[in-house]
């Protein structure tokens, strides 16, 4: 009985170690319609400029201030200002001095955001663009699980064999 459990555990170990590599190969070999798809920004015949449609540029909207083709696909929106921010660095544990902050209360981890400073509506004579002024904010995050998912299966099988 122990021998059969050991064989099953060994087979699970082999499958767990090979599964991520096999999955990544399959993802790179996707063919068919997916290769023929294009984003609207990449296709000249489908792309339309705001002037052609008649869209008025809104300088208060952070997404209309710049060319949409240049905007990163991975945006993070700051819940306080509503502006599009860029992620800076990795998810890190909150220091004890910041444990009471809203972004640290949820998970105990934080990630730095580089956000544009919102324009003060009372200051009409502001000479700089709001996107030129940046400020650092934080958002709650959870640390990335760096362990491979197959390792948990192997650990489970080994515990079953040993018990």
Swiss-Prot record:
Signal peptide: 1-23
Main location: secreted
Keyword Ubl conjugation: no
Intracellular or extracellular location(s): Secreted; Host cell membrane
Entry keyword annotation includes Signal: yes
Recorded superkingdom: Eukaryota
A GO CC annotation given for this chain: extracellular region
Motif mapping: RxLR-dEER: 37-52
Keyword list, A-Z: Host cell membrane, Host membrane, Membrane, Secreted, Signal, Virulence
Family recorded in the similarity comment: Belongs to the RxLR effector family.
Record remark: domains: The RxLR-dEER motif acts to carry the protein into the host cell cytoplasm through binding to cell surface phosphatidylinositol-3-phosphate.
Role played: Effector that enhances P.infestans colonization of Nicotiana benthamiana leaves.
Protein name as it appears in the record: RxLR effector protein PITG_13625
Organism field: Phytophthora infestans (strain T30-4) (Potato late blight agent)
